[in-house]
UniProtKB/Swiss-Prot annotation:
Function of the protein: Specifically methylates the uridine in position 2552 of 23S rRNA at the 2'-O position of the ribose in the fully assembled 50S ribosomal subunit.
HAMAP family registered for this protein in UniProt: RNA_methyltr_E (MF_01547)
Organism: Cupriavidus taiwanensis (strain DSM 17343 / BCRC 17206 / CCUG 44338 / CIP 107171 / LMG 19424 / R1)
Family listed: Belongs to the class I-like SAM-binding methyltransferase superfamily. RNA methyltransferase RlmE family.
Protein name stated in the entry: Ribosomal RNA large subunit methyltransferase E
Chief location of this protein within or outside the cell: cytoplasm
Gene: rlmE
GO-annotated cellular components: cytoplasm
Length: 221
């Protein structure tokens, strides 16, 4: 009975969620687009000409938002966007116009090579401007296990950013408050000159999710 009440409550909240309604009206696949939108408007992350990698992209709302921003550039002509968006996820994703999607686990060598090849082609052999990560683990409810899973995904995003970002680039990751949160923030501070925490209004009040933004890579000795 308790589970049914929970499901009914979630469904009621979801149906009446203004961000869900807005996403349906504006053609976004998920309300998560407005989390990125709010952070982008505050921090000016997405700019014309950028090469952007979206980790954990499915169902694709962050890629949609990034693509739309690049399409708004005065230099976007002949149906092409001004820049590039490369998305990757373990799960399948319906195509997004102008977005290159790779389905697979980028921890696997063959998938990682494909990702690197696509990124190099998109950037003209240069490094990338922005890494987005909305990756989230399946939470077990066991605090210590969940903290380890969350930290692991953040570590993957940090490692990818360290290897592929331009010095002036940025990394935005989803995280959750918990026992490992402070360690993740410290890792960001070791890797980036500027670190900020963001809790957009589109994040549900009941959710412990937050976003960590790192900008300007520190020089690795």
């Amino acid at each position: 009975m308790a589970k049914n009440k929970f499901n009914h409550s979630w469904l009621h909240d979801h149906i009446n969620d203004p961000y869900v309604k807005m996403a349906q009206r504006e053609g976004y696949r998920a309300r998560a687009a407005y989390k990125l939108k709010e952070i982008d408007e505050q921090d000016k992350l997405i700019r014309p000409g950028q090469v952007i990698v979206d980790l954990g992209a499915a169902p694709g709302s962050w890629s949609q938002y990034a693509r739309n921003k690049l399409a708004d550039s005065p230099r976007a002509r002949d149906g092409r966007i001004d820049g590039a968006v490369v998305a990757i996820d373990l799960l399948p994703m319906e195509p997004v116009a102008d977005v290159t999607f790779i389905q697979g686990d980028f921890r696997e060598e063959s998938v990682f090579r494909e990702l690197e090849s696509v990124v190099l082609d998109a950037s003209g052999g240069n490094k990338i401007d922005l890494v987005l990560s909305d990756m989230a683990p399946n939470l077990s409810g066991v605090a210590s296990a969940d903290a380890a899973r969350i930290e692991y995904l953040c570590d993957l995003a940090l490692e990818f950013a360290q290897a592929h970002l331009k010095p002036e680039g940025a990394l935005l990751v989803k995280c959750f408050h918990g026992s490992g949160y402070s360690q993740i923030v410290e890792k960001f501070k070791r890797q980036f000159k500027v670190v900020a925490k963001r809790k957009p209004k589109a994040s549900r009040d009941k959710s412990s999710e937050t976003f960590i933004l790192g900008r300007y890579l520190k020089t690795v000795d």
